């Protein structure tokens, strides 16, 4: 990718060639589908929009000195996504299908994997959303699992250098006995006020 400065990438979104999708309907998961579209169509009453039926994961692919592409312990991410699904009553995706989707999307976007020792990586974002239309708090009957990728630089530009930390005592990321042990979007939405405040004061890690 001659137009990408691999050593100066931010941790943000960059369009790549393909994403992979899979739908849960009639009590079972379908086959993996490949799409080049960045857009998804969902019903206005989908449970992901109203009742928070959404989970996601994050992992990276790296290119080694030998030119091979490696992803570290993707099965553990698949298991954690299953745990998130159980936590908010979504359909569980088999770990084998999760791994198949990861391998497929990385292969399809191989040209976006940064070179060895560039300091960058191919970030992999699996996510699942409730698609079924519901008015009333109940689980959806249909779900979509998808994976997209984007090349990224380090999350913290300072790398392993010491970072200032801001502890916010006025906000909770997740309630006790709630969803704090699973990876769902609501946990992160609850931090946005605190994050906005600390961005006004100093570059920090928010706890």
Task: List each model region and its residues.
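Conserved alpha/beta cores of soluble small-molecule-handling proteins
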Residues: 1-197
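Conserved small/polar residues in nucleotide/adenosyl-binding loops
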Residues: 198-204
């Amino acid at each position: 990718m001659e137009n990408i400065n691999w050593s100066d990438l931010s941790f943000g979104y960059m369009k790549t060639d393909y994403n992979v999708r899979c739908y849960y309907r009639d009590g079972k998961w379908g086959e993996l589908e490949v799409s080049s579209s960045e857009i998804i169509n969902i019903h206005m009453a989908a449970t992901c929009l109203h009742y928070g039926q959404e989970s996601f994961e994050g992992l990276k692919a790296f290119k080694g000195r030998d030119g091979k592409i490696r992803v570290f312990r993707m099965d553990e991410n698949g298991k954690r996504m299953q745990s998130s699904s159980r936590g908010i009553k979504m359909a569980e995706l088999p770990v084998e299908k999760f791994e198949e989707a990861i391998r497929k999307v990385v292969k399809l976007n191989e040209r976006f994997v940064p070179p060895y020792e560039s300091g960058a990586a191919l970030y992999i974002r699996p996510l699942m959303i409730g698609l079924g239309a519901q008015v009333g708090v109940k689980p959806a009957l249909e779900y979509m699992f998808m994976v997209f990728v984007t090349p990224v630089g380090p999350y913290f530009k300072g790398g392993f250098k010491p970072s200032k930390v801001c502890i916010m005592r006025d906000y909770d990321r997740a309630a006790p006995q709630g969803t704090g042990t699973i990876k769902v979007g609501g946990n992160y939405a609850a931090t946005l006020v605190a994050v906005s405040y600390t961005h006004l004061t100093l570059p920090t890690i928010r706890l």
